[in-house]
């Protein structure tokens, strides 16, 4: 993500007029997971009515990705928000609901998180649809229910989703079973786009160490000593390509 794209995304977040109320539960029992750059908590949201009708808008559960306060994590969060906005809606990609600056919740006492340390710096909040579990969790707890037809259906859905991403010049960069969510009817949804790469990025990625998870990482990412970013003349590392996702998908399956 270039500096201009980063500034544009930050301005979009701060200038949004989403008319959405959010309740964020930072208690440990509501923690859904965590990663290198963020923690995910259960939340609830509803959007304000845009007309004068008396229809009641109910609260809906959501997953709130609370990005760590350090610069690297905030940049990864902005990159994920940018990627999800750019890709748009897809049946097998987690749905982006909104992106907020946590300062907005602090400034509005009616929306303030119920648990919040006063010395904790504000974070970027990525509000996503809430799904029951990850593929990893389901396979561990329902071993007898995961038969070959179900696994083949998941494989087809994942392959079609990766193909769709690649047709739009997007490399997910961190495909693994923990980043695959399941709906109530056991359809898959790919999540965690914080490592995403775009083939036409204005600022190519040259750091292989920050891409992917070691157990699912393509072997060429471990052989980088013969390549110098200084000699690349603005080009991305040759290993950072669509083949990364193909290898990771093969490991997952």
Roles of regions detected by a PLM:
Residues 119-134:
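Conserved short submotifs of the Hanks-type protein kinase catalytic core
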Residues 43-75:
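ATP-binding glycine-rich loop module of kinase domains
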């Amino acid at each position: 993500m270039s500096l201009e794209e980063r500034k544009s995304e930050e301005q979009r977040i701060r200038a949004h007029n989403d008319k959405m109320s959010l309740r964020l539960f930072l208690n440990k029992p509501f923690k859904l997971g965590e990663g290198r750059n963020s923690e995910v908590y259960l939340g609830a949201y509803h959007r304000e009515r845009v007309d004068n009708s008396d229809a009641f808008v109910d609260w809906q559960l959501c997953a709130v990705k609370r990005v760590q306060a350090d610069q690297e994590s905030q940049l990864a969060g902005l990159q994920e928000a940018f990627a999800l906005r750019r890709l748009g809606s897809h049946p097998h990609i987690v749905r982006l609901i909104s992106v907020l600056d946590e300062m907005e919740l602090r400034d509005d006492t009616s929306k303030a998180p119920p648990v919040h340390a006063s010395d904790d710096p504000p974070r970027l909040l990525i509000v996503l649809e809430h799904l029951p579990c990850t593929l990893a969790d389901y396979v561990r707890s329902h071993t007898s229910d995961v038969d070959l037809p179900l696994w083949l259906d998941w494989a087809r859905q994942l392959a079609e989703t990766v193909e769709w991403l690649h047709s739009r010049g997007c490399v997910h960069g961190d495909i693994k079973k923990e980043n695959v969510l399941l709906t109530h009817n056991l359809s898959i949804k790919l999540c965690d786009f914080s490592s995403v790469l775009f083939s036409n990025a204005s600022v190519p990625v040259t750091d292989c160490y920050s891409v992917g998870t070691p157990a699912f990482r393509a072997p060429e990412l471990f052989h980088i000593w013969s390549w110098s970013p200084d000699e690349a003349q603005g080009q991305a590392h040759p290993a950072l390509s669509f083949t990364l996702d193909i290898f990771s998908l093969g490991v997952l399956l």
